[in-house]
């Protein structure tokens, strides 16, 4: 019997045991004081209630999207590394990927891939998202550690229960969508059955898309791989296909809630136009048990979860598959992630609250590349990229919240965390080309005889203050000291034998080759941040936020020349470079501005209001005085929206400045500025909703500022793709979606 399914049976038995001890009755419906305070003190992040993100208002975006990270695009300070069609990486104030703590239904998920093709947000379908909370770099220590850029919490829809006088509930909804560019199509369903004390939910979603087209040709027409021809507009390796299933069970008593969520994901294909490989299979199984109890003195919250991923990469149709007699380059990763969180909060007085908690995470990963063909390049043995990789986290934290007066609030927190890492012995495809793994002088041998165990003792501190003299004006400010340890790939990728193997370890999308560094130290970030918030909806219908920030990072992990850390890497003639990693110094600063204003309201024209936001961030390596990689240039978004009867109509204008402050060591590409126009409309009716519109209405050609280097076709394994082409954005695309409730 499958190991995970044995675990599921055990958990179901635990649920049955809890059920027998529950006192069934109506659960208290009011939010806890802790939840109310947290939403108040979050700096430039909140329990999102903006259109297209939370609850019913997110329906329009979720109904046409396949990429959950895209739900965050309108959050101030947020940008996206565009990668595969399902796997964008969020970046908050210039810090992305593992520098952010990303939780899905409370689970701290980890990307099990040398190219980070399966980031945490790819494990939940947009149609299953109930709410999102974004907390920036001065987030409370209880929101998660081992990160320096902030926390993103994505939760599926909350468990539904019937009222005592309502009887049983059976309801749900189903949806379909189509996008003209890439012929993207998909369907989803969500069904609920509930009594006053029991809740059951099932959700499923499927999505499929072909390669998308840019607004104009950015390369030559022709043969991209054997049997595959791409046009000059076609972005190779941008197709995808996915399937997601989720089951939820919940029982509640008068002061208790127990939830069990099971998840299954299968992605048979996801192309990556900025990677040399493509995802040819990703299967994930998740089990998540959550318990919460309200007591006289406060609340207890406990969670235990397990997630396992089987991930495969190779070349899809647009990339060359045969190299001599070698059929592709199969790469596999197996990740096993187990975690537990225990948290309790005590109401000490009407003024003070104390939150104490502990967190445990145990992660195991193997990354290997099976032999291909009979030549010396990829045979006859299995290439061991990371063997028995271990990354264990154990943390304790405490927070003290004080409502000093009706106008002043503070939250102080400290977190102590130990991160222990290790890995086993490695080996190349053969000893002649890659070195004898038992020798003390070969590349794998030096790694195998090194001390590979890492023990990091990390400290996080946060201090947040809020001044709100009235309901229309508030000032939030704070300081945070946050720490992140390197991930397994940053420390334990060892191979610098040739360009081919270095190309395969790249989680940046820049086309370069990378080798890790056993000597990496944790990153330490100090952040100062503030938000000025003014609103007056009664008199003038206006809201305004201004939020500056500054972050200094000690031991920032950045790309360096191999020679600077004592490694010898092959030179290249294709414009890309082979690099390693080292601790540097960096700083990031910027400002977010957002506003909303009601312009007019009448019976004939409905409500018309304007929204807008401007985001600026600058990131710099202060040792080299060059730009940090993938920093979003100055950008703004403005929209004019009309709401009349059941119709909502939106005209949106997005403007992005040119990107020229780039990472020189990586030969990061500059991009030009651009402006896009989007037109959207939706119609709500009692049993559902219809959305339709046009993205990139004027069919403007542009390069994605955070899209990386174009590697979507051809002989990508070695040096067959020249440097210098950026990944273009999507050309004009019409869409339509429908959601029906039952």
Which residue stretches match the model-derived regions?
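Flexible loop and strand-edge segments within Gram-negative outer membrane beta-barrel domains
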Residues: 238-242, 255-300, 308-337, 375, ...
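Transmembrane beta-barrel wall of Gram-negative outer-membrane proteins
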Residues: 180-209, 219-268, 279, 283-297, ...
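Short acidic/polar hinge/loop motifs at secondary-structure boundaries
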Residues: 109-138
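C-terminal beta-signal and adjacent terminal beta-strands/loops
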Residues: 215, 483-484, 559-561, 657-661, ...
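Gram-negative outer-membrane beta-barrel transporters
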Residues: 403-410, 418-419, 537-538, 542-562, ...
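Outer-membrane beta-barrel signature, preferentially recognizing the C-terminal barrel domain
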Residues: 135, 277-296, 329-337, 385-393, ...
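N-terminal periplasmic "start-of-domain" segments of outer-membrane beta-barrel proteins
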Residues: 37-71, 89-91, 97
């Amino acid at each position: 019997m499958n190991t995970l399914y044995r675990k599921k049976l055990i958990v179901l038995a635990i649920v049955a045991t809890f059920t027998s001890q529950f006192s069934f009755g109506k659960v208290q419906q009011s939010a806890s004081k802790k939840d109310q305070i947290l939403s108040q003190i979050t700096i430039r992040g909140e329990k999102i209630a903006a259109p297209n993100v939370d609850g019913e208002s997110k329906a329009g975006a979720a109904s046409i999207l396949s990429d959950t990270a895209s739900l965050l695009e309108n959050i101030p300070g947020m940008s996206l590394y565009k990668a595969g069609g399902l796997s964008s990486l969020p970046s908050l104030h210039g810090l992305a990927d593992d520098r952010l703590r990303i939780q899905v239904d409370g689970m701290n998920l980890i990307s099990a891939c040398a190219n980070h093709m399966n980031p945490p947000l790819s494990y939940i379908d947009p149609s299953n998202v109930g709410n999102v909370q974004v907390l920036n770099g001065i987030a409370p220590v209880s929101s998660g550690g081992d990160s320096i850029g902030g926390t993103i919490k994505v939760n599926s829809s909350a468990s539904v229960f019937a009222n005592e006088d309502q009887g049983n509930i059976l309801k749900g909804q189903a949806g379909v969508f189509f996008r003209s560019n890439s012929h993207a199509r998909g369907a989803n369903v969500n069904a609920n059955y509930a009594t006053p004390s029991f809740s059951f939910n099932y959700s499923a979603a499927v999505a499929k898309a072909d390669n998308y087209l840019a607004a104009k040709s950015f390369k030559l027409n022709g043969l991209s791989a054997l049997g595959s021809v791409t046009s000059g507009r076609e972005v190779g390796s941008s197709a995808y296909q996915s399937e997601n299933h989720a089951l939820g069970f919940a029982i509640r008593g008068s002061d208790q809630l127990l939830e069990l969520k099971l998840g299954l994901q299968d992605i048979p294909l996801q192309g990556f136009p900025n990677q040399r490989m493509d995802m040819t299979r990703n299967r994930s199984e998740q089990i998540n048990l959550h318990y919460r109890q309200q007591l006289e003195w406060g609340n207890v919250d406990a969670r235990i979860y397990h997630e396992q991923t089987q991930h495969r990469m190779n070349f899809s149709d647009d990339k060359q598959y045969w190299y001599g007699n070698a059929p592709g380059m199969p790469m596999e990763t197996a990740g096993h992630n187990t975690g537990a969180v225990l948290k309790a909060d005590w109401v000490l007085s009407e003024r003070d609250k104390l939150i104490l908690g502990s967190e445990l995470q145990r992660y195991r990963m193997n990354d290997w590349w099976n032999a291909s063909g009979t030549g010396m390049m990829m045979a006859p043995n299995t290439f061991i990229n990371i063997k028995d990789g271990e990354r264990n986290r154990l943390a304790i934290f405490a927070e003290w919240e004080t409502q000093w007066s009706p106008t002043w609030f503070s939250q102080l927190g400290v977190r102590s965390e130990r991160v222990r890492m290790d890995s086993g012995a490695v080996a190349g495809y053969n000893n002649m080309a890659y070195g004898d793994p038992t020798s003390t002088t070969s590349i794998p041998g030096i790694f195998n005889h090194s001390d590979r165990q890492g023990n990091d003792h990390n400290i996080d501190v946060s201090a947040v203050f809020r001044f709100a003299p009235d309901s229309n004006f508030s000032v939030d400010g704070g300081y945070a000291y946050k720490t992140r340890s390197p991930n397994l790939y940053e420390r334990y990728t060892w191979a610098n034998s040739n360009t081919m193997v270095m190309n395969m370890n790249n989680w940046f999308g820049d086309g370069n080759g990378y080798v890790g560094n056993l000597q990496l130290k944790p990153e330490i970030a100090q952040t100062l941040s503030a938000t000025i918030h003014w609103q007056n909806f009664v008199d003038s219908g206006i809201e305004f936020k201004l939020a500056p920030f500054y972050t200094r990072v000690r031991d920032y992990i950045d790309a360096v020349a191999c020679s600077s850390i004592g490694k010898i890497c092959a030179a290249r003639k294709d414009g890309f470079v082979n690099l390693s990693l080292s601790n540097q110094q960096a700083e990031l600063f910027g400002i977010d501005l957002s506003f909303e204003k009601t312009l007019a309201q009448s019976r004939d024209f409905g409500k018309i209001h304007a929204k807008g936001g401007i985001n600026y961030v600058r990131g710099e390596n202060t040792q080299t005085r060059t730009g940090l990689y993938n920093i979003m240039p100055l950008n703004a978004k403005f929209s004019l929206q009309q709401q009349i009867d059941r119709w909502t109509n939106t005209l949106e204008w997005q403007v992005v400045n040119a990107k020229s402050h780039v990472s020189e060591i990586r030969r990061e590409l500059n991009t030009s500025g651009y402006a896009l126009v989007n037109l959207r409309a939706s119609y709500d009716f009692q049993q559902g909703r219809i959305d339709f519109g046009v993205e990139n209405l004027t069919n403007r050609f542009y390069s994605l500022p955070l899209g990386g280097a174009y590697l979507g076709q051809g002989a990508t394994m070695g040096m067959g793709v020249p440097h210098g082409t950026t990944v273009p954005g999507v050309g004009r695309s019409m869409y339509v979606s429908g959601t029906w409730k039952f």
